[in-house]
């Protein structure tokens, strides 16, 4: 995929698409998580928010992931030594674990959360962890571009017979 990096137009298009999807997907995640925490959109049921945004979040995630994978492929050698890249990857693994744990407990049946007079703790934990992890992904993803590997100090060896 190095042709993307070397092209005049493809790389900016892929990067712009990735960033646009981050903004859209991220906004939908924030809306969902704030509702799970009970901090916003209290005039809407949790089920309406979760179910209403589900399709859009999936589409945004798929495009965002595809563009991110394409970006990685175009500069894999640059990303490999980058600690921010690895922290981002770790956070994405933690998000996958979050999804595996909380999908059956919270996201698959959000109408059960509305039946309770108080938002269940499991929903609040899911929302809080999601906000923290996605924020960490976003921040570390942003920092990837600013990382500069340490420069190796060159050794100057004096030629024999010189002072």
Where are these regions (language model features)?
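Polytopic transmembrane helical bundles with strong interfacial aromatic enrichment
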Residues: 1-163
């Amino acid at each position: 995929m190095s042709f993307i990096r070397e092209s005049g137009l493809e790389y900016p298009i892929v990067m712009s698409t990735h960033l646009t999807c981050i903004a859209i997907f991220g906004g939908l995640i924030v809306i969902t998580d704030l509702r799970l925490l009970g901090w916003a959109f209290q005039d809407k049921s949790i089920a309406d928010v979760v179910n209403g945004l589900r399709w859009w979040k999936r589409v945004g995630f798929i495009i965002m992931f595809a563009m991110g994978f394409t970006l990685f492929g175009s500069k894999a050698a640059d990303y490999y030594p980058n600690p921010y890249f690895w922290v981002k990857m770790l956070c994405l693994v933690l998000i996958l674990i979050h999804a595996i744990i909380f999908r059956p407990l919270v996201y698959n049946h959000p109408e059960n959360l509305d039946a309770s007079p108080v938002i269940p703790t499991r929903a609040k934990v899911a929302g809080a962890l999601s906000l923290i992890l996605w924020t960490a992904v976003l921040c570390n993803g942003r920092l990837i571009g600013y990382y500069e590997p340490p420069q190796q100090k060159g050794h100057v060896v004096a030629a024999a017979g010189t002072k």
